[in-house]
Amino acid sequence: MKQKTILKEVSLKGPGLHFGQETCLTIKPASPDTGYIFKRVDLEGKPEIPAIADLVSDTSRGTTISKYKASVSTIEHLLAATYSLGLDNILFEIDGPEVPILDGSSKYFVEAFHKAGIKEQDAELKVYEINENLSFVDEERDIEISTFPDKSYKLKVLLDYKSEILSNQYAFLNNLKDFTKGVAPCRTFVFLSELEPLLHLNLIKGGDLDNAIVIVDKESTQEEFDRLAKLFNKPSVAVQSSGVLNNLKLQFTNEPARHKLLDVIGDLALTGFRFNGSVVARRPGHFGNTEMAKLIRQHILNQKNQPSPDNIPVYTQNSKPLMDSQKIKEILPNRYPFLFVDKIMSLTKTEVIGVKNVSNDEYYFSGHYPNNPVMPVALQLEAILQTAKLFLLSSNGSDKNTYEFPQISNIVFKRQVVPGDVLIIKVSQVDPVNGFIRLKGEAFVGTELVAEADIDAKKIK
C-alpha cells in the first residue's frame, strides 16, 4: 500500500465558528512522510504546526494545536475528511487562527479533496496494529474511550446526555469508505442551554442557525427565542417536532451521534499514524478524544522503537566465536581495563555481532555503585563504538587507515545493565550521510534492546 496526497492545490474560504474571522484555507500536496502540517501564512516567518496530539493546546469548544506562539483552531472536521479519504501527506496553508466552519460538517472538505484529485506516492504506507487494550476514563466528565486490537479501523460512539433527544443515541463506522456518505455531511450541534452563554463569551462569533444543530434541552419562552433570533440576525426561530431549534432538517435521526463520530476520527488523526484498532467512545468530546490520540500515538511510537524479531541477534554461551579476545587485540588498540568487546560472533560486509560479558568483578562496579552495581551508560556506548571500529577495520582488510567518529546521535539507553548480563552488540552499516559512513549501533540483553545510537564514521590517515 502506498502513501497518498492530492494532485493539485485547492482553496476554501469562510469564517471560523468561534472567532468569526474570515479565513482562506489552501490545501496543497506534500512529499512522502510529511504527514499533516498547518502553516500560518499570515504570521511573521509563516510558522508550521505539525498536526500531532503532542501539540494540542485547547479543547474547550474544538481542537486547537499550537507551536511557539502560533496556533490553529477547530481543525477536527478538516482532519476527519483528510484521514477518511486515505490522504497521508498534506500541507494546510491558512491565513487566520481558525479553520472555516462552512456548514459545520466535513462535507465541503471532502468535496474539495475530490476536486483536487488524489494520487499515490512512491513511498510505502505503514499501518500499525494496536496490540493491547488502551483506555482513557474521566470520571468527572463521565467520559470513557477505549481502543481494542482489531484487524481493521472501526469506531463506535455512544451518547448519553440528560436530554430526551440524546439520552441514548449511537453511531458506528466499520469502513472509512462509508465516511463520505454516512458521516461527512453530519453537522455540529450545541445544546440550547449552552448557546447564550457561548454567545456572551464571544465563543461562537462565526456560528449561525445554518451551520449548527441546536438541541432544545430546556423549557424556553418565546421571548428567549426572539432574543436568540436577534443574536443570529434571523427573523424568528422555533422548535421543530424533532426537538431541534430553527428550520434545519436532520439528515439522519442519529445525526448528532454521527457528528461525534466525525469528531473522533478528526481528533484521532492527531496520532500521526495509520492504525488498525476498534475505538469505542462513550460521551466523547475533544478533550477525551485527544487524550486517546496521545495514548495511541505513544503506543505506536513504542512499537517503532522496538526492533523486529528478525533483527534481534541470537547468542548462546556455547556458540563458537569468529574472533576471541586475542584476535580482537590484533585489530583494536584498546587494552584492559578499557577493552569492552570480548568476542565477535559474526562479521559480514554490512554487519557485525559482538559480545561483552558483564561480570561481577568489573573494576567500575566498586564505585558505580557500591551495593547496587550498574554498568555506566558511557561504557555501554563505548562497547558499541569499539564494535563499530572493529567492523570498519576488519571490513578494509589490509587497509592501514583508522577511523574516527565525528558525530554520534539519537543515543537512547532503555534499561540498566547489571552484573551477569551479556551485552550482545550489533552494528550495521546503512546509507552514507554527507560523506560519512553511517552505522546503526544496538546493544541487547537477551532479546531486549537496552541501548542504541546512530554513528557517523570518517576515515583518517
Stretch-by-stretch model annotation:
Residues 1-88, 93-312:
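C-terminal regulatory domains involved in ligand/effector binding and gene-expression control
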Residues 5-9, 322-328, 423-424:
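Short Pro/Gly-enriched beta-strand edge/turn motifs at strand-loop
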Residues 79-83, 404-422, 428-434:
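Active-site beta-strand->loop segment that positions catalytic residues and contacts the acyl thioester
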Residues 89, 278, 342-346, 410:
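Extracellular/lumenal ectodomain signal focusing on beta-strand-rich modules
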Residues 171-189, 375, 443-451, 455-461:
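Flexible glycine-rich active-site/ligand-binding loops centered on an Asp-His dyad
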Residues 258-271, 344, 374-400:
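Active-site helix/loop of acyl-thioester processing domains in fatty-acid/polyketide metabolism
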Residues 305-374, 394, 400-402, 417-418, ...:
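Non-catalytic linker/capping segments at the edges of enzyme domains
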Residues 435-440:
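Short aromatic-glycine-enriched beta-strand elements
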